[in-house]
Structures are given as C-alpha cells and as structure tokens.
C-alpha cells in the first residue's frame, strides 16, 4: 500500500458550475440546480455562492428558497452534464487505464504506473486539474495519497480548486485533526454513540484500543473505524464497464386483467432488480416499468431521479407510483421493471423517498 499513488478528483459544484459556465449571467450568483420551490422539488446541487446560506444537496427546494430568496433555480440538464463528464473521463484514461468513476463528477485514479511516464503523483494531479480547466472551463479539486480512503478525504480539504497531497508519513497527523464525522461512511448515529463515550476526534480513536471500539460498535464496525482512523485501506482502484441497465420481467401463463396479480408479479420482479443492483454495488437514476398487451404491443413508463439511489423503499414506492398511473385497456401478457443510468455509488448521501416528495 505504501508504494501506491492514488488520486481522487472531484469536480467543484459540478452541475451548478456547468450552468454558470454556459450562462455567464449566473456567475457569482447563488445557483440551485433542482426542482422549483413551488413544486416541492429537491436540491440536486448548488453553487458555492448558495452554499454560504447553508443550502446543500437533498434539501427541499422550498427550504432553500427560504434561506436564499434571491437564488436562481435551474432545471437539471443531465445530457449536458454527461457530455462534460465524458470529456473528463477521457482525460483520466489518457493518464492511466486504472480509473474508477464514482459518479459523473468524481473518480479514483491509480497513477503508480501511468501513460505520462511521470513519477510524481503531485505533478500528475496538477496536470489533470490544469487540463480539466483548459478543456471544460471548470475547476476540480484533487487529493493525492497512498490509499483511496485518504485521497478522497484529501480532495475535499481545500475545495474549491484545491490540491492536497498526503505522503505516507503525513497521513496519521492529518487524520488526527479531523472530527469523527469527517470519516467517510460515519453517520450521525455512529458519531453520537462515540461522542457519548468521549470520542470526538479521529485522534481519540487512534489512541484507543481496538477492543474498546469493537465493544461499542460491534466487531466489524469497530474494526472498520479503527483501520479508517489509521488510514489503512487496501482497496484497489477498480475500473469497470458501465452496465447500461438491470431488469427483470415475467410472462403470464395466460393473459390477465387481474390488477392484484399483475402488481404482485411486478413487485416480485422489482425486488429481484433491487437485489441485483445492490449485489453489483451500483446505484441507478431511472426506473422503468414495462408491460406487453395481449396483441404483443409493448408499453412503458419511467421516472428519473435528480440523484442516484439504490434504496429499496424508494425504488419500490416509485415502481408502485408508476404502476398506479397506468390505465390498462385489456389483458396483459407480460410485466417487468428495470433500472438504468447505473453508476458506482458515491459515498455521499443517496436520495430516499423523503427526498423526492416532488413526485407525490
């Protein structure tokens, strides 16, 4: 692990920055990308100008408007964001084949060996940030270290347009100054549990015996937190081909008009899809239900989230919502559900049903 050179690159307020780039009059203005406040929408992301007001992703748009009435709300243009993301990923692959995208706007790169024939990961990161700016007009931040865990934490340390480099001997001192909640994957419940027992910083964890953490959090979670606090992360950068969709469908033995039978079949197929989605460690952004009529005509309905999710309750409730909107005009011979726009999950919060009440 010591000899590895890992870079984590994270675009700065990606969606909002694209909108400010394409609409110069929005530069310097609080920009919120997401649903409008009057329609019970949700904030997908926002510019740094808006973040100064306490606005953040997954916040109800109505609340964001209350915090900053002069903010400009912009509908997401995912086709544009995907095109810009493709430019950025192309750059990464010019540097190294070992690229692991986490979402449209961030990725890990293993540059231990690289196409630039450069030995300094710092210089490679500087090159990448400069090229992103030149090719897209956008800024990004990067973290450089010997593990994915530390590189990702480092990339957020000096945002926006920042670069933080943590060689092996700097990892423990850097981590020791962080709050426990700064460790990725540590939620409020875990943080509060530890705080009740006198753990407030990563340094507190570093100085405690692993047995104490296991006693508080359980063997697996306690061990995980202990290793994270010491910057230990053996995970490899895993390039993957994007799978376009995951689906499951069922053909009835006889065409049916029984709504309960059709729905229970759809629910079973949906559960199968969600199980596969989680087994593959992916998140999705679009849910589609498909049905086929007795005359073999295919029909479909779909819903696209503002952000990716793999939350079972969210996906099942959207599937149910779509099903309830269908007006069947005759017997059905096939029903199925699929998810698409698949990506590796970001470590940030996934949307849940409460976040997408704009669809109710």
UniProtKB/Swiss-Prot annotation:
Active site: 106
Catalytic activity of the protein: DNA(n) + a 2'-deoxyribonucleoside 5'-triphosphate = DNA(n+1) + diphosphate
Protein name according to UniProt: DNA polymerase IV
HAMAP family (UniProt xref): DNApol_IV
Keyword Cytoplasm: yes
Cofactor(s) recorded in Swiss-Prot or TrEMBL: Mg(2+)
Superkingdom assignment: Bacteria
Keywords of the record: Cytoplasm, DNA damage, DNA repair, DNA replication, DNA-binding, DNA-directed DNA polymerase, Magnesium, Metal-binding, Mutator protein, Nucleotidyltransferase, Transferase
Annotated UmuC domain residues: 6-187
EC numbers, comma separated: 2.7.7.7
Binding site for Mg(2+): 10, 105
Sections of the chain in a coiled coil: none
Classification via CDD domains: PolY_Pol_IV_kappa
GO CC, any one term: cytosol
Function description: Poorly processive, error-prone DNA polymerase involved in untargeted mutagenesis. Copies undamaged DNA at stalled replication forks, which arise in vivo from mismatched or misaligned primer ends. These misaligned primers can be extended by PolIV. Exhibits no 3'-5' exonuclease (proofreading) activity. May be involved in translesional synthesis, in conjunction with the beta clamp from PolIII.
Molecular function, one GO term: magnesium ion binding
Quaternary organization: Monomer.
The record's free-text note on cofactor binding: Binds 2 magnesium ions per subunit.
Enzyme class, UniProt record, top EC level: transferase
GN (gene name): dinB
Subcellular location(s) per record: Cytoplasm
Site-annotated residues for Substrate discrimination: 15
GO biological process: DNA-templated DNA replication; error-prone translesion synthesis; SOS response
């Amino acid at each position: 692990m010591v000899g590895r050179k890992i870079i984590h690159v994270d675009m700065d307020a990606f969606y909002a920055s694209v909108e400010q780039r394409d609409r110069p009059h929005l530069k310097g203005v609080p920009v919120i990308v997401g649903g409008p406040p009057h329609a019970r929408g949700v904030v997908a992301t926002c510019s740094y100008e808006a973040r100064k007001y306490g606005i953040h992703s997954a916040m109800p748009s109505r609340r964001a408007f209350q915090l900053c009435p002069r903010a400009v709300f912009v509908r997401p243009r995912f086709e544009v964001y995907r095109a810009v993301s493709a430019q950025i990923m192309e750059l990464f692959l010019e540097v190294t084949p070992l690229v692991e995208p986490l979402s449209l706007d961030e990725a890990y790169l293993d540059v231990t060996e690289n196409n630039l024939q450069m030995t300094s990961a710092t210089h490679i990161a500087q090159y990448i940030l400069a090229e992103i700016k030149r090719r897209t007009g956008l800024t990004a931040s990067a973290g450089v270290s010997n593990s994915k865990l530390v590189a990702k934490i480092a990339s957020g340390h000096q945002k926006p347009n920042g670069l933080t480099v943590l060689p092996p001997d700097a990892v423990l001192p850097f981590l020791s100054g962080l709050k426990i909640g700064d460790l990725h994957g540590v939620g409020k419940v875990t943080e509060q549990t530890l705080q009740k027992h006198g753990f407030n910083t990563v340094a507190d964890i570093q100085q405690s015996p692993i047995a104490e953490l296991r006693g508080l959090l359980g063997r697996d979670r306690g061990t995980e937190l202990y290793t994270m606090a010491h910057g230990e992360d053996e995970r490899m950068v895993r390039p993957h081909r994007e799978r376009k969709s995951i689906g499951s469908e069922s053909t009835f033995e006889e065409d049916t008009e029984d709504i309960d039978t059709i729905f229970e079949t759809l629910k079973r197929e949906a559960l199968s899809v969600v199980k596969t989605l989680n087994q593959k460690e992916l998140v999705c952004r679009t849910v589609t239900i498909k049905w086929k009529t007795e005359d073999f005509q295919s029909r479909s309905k779909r819903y696209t989230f503002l952000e990716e999710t793999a939350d079972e309750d969210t996906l099942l409730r959207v599937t149910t919502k779509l099903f309830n909107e269908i007006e069947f005009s005759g017997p059905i011979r096939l029903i199925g559900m699929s998810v698409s726009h698949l990506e590796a999950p970001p470590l940030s919060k996934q949307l849940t049903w409460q976040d997408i009440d704009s669809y109710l």
